Amino acid sequence: MADLLGSILSSMEKPPSLGDQESRRKAREQAARLKKLQEQDKQQKVEFRKRMEKEVSDFIQDSGQVKKKFQPMNKIERSILHDVVEVAGLTSFSFGEDDDCRYVMIFKKEFAPSDEELDSYRHGEEWDPQKAEEKRKLKELAQKQEEEAAQQGPAVVSPASDYKDKYSHLIGKGAAKDAAHMLQANKTYGCVPVANKRDTRSIEEAMNEIRAKKRLRQSGEELPTTS
């Protein structure tokens, strides 16, 4: 009988020591604080969502606004705002490099931003429609000029022999032909001495010399022959 009573008493849970009681008390307090923080966080999210719903509603009713930029928010707040905007049937984007500096912009559906506008915001620039239009026109003009140049092909350089036709009415076809040959010779220096390459005379001086030679030939042809 004594052995049975001893076994029953030994199987019963011993009362907690003072150390165990303190640990359990701290655990209960910590759980209570955590629950309170969770409730506060939940309440803050609810209040934030209501505030965003109010701002989005005011934005929709304001016909003078087509877009709205919000202050930087954390990731959770941005997620809530994006959800509110989607429910309202609007468009929203987040911009900013660092997470602490990222912000949300919302747009009315009929005024959705273009790719150029979004690119400006992504680079931290303000969107200027007038400058964007000027940039677009310059780009189109440059592209048009490139296409026209490609269709025309390489530029044709007029040969030196064109001087014959240019000056034939002034000094005669024969003299103009000589001038053309002279100009052509001045361009082909590959097989002549260096001294012959340096012809510093102007075109007028060369033509005057040719005229003089022509007059000299003509005067020689007109002299009477002696028997």
UniProtKB/Swiss-Prot annotation:
It is found in: Nucleus. It holds the Pfam family R3H. A motif (Nuclear localization signal) lies at residues 35-51, 122-139. The modification Phosphoserine is found at S114, S158, S202. GO terms for cellular component: nucleus. Residues 46-109 form the R3H domain. Residues 1-45, 118-161 are annotated as: Disordered. It comes from the Eukaryota. Keywords: Acetylation, Nucleus, Phosphoprotein. Its main location: nucleus. Residues 21-45, 119-147 have a biased composition (Basic and acidic residues). The modification N-acetylalanine is found at A2. GO terms for molecular function: nucleic acid binding. PANTHER family: SPERM ASSOCIATED ANTIGEN 7 (PTHR13498), SPERM-ASSOCIATED ANTIGEN 7 (PTHR13498:SF3). This is Sperm-associated antigen 7. It comes from Mus musculus (Mouse).
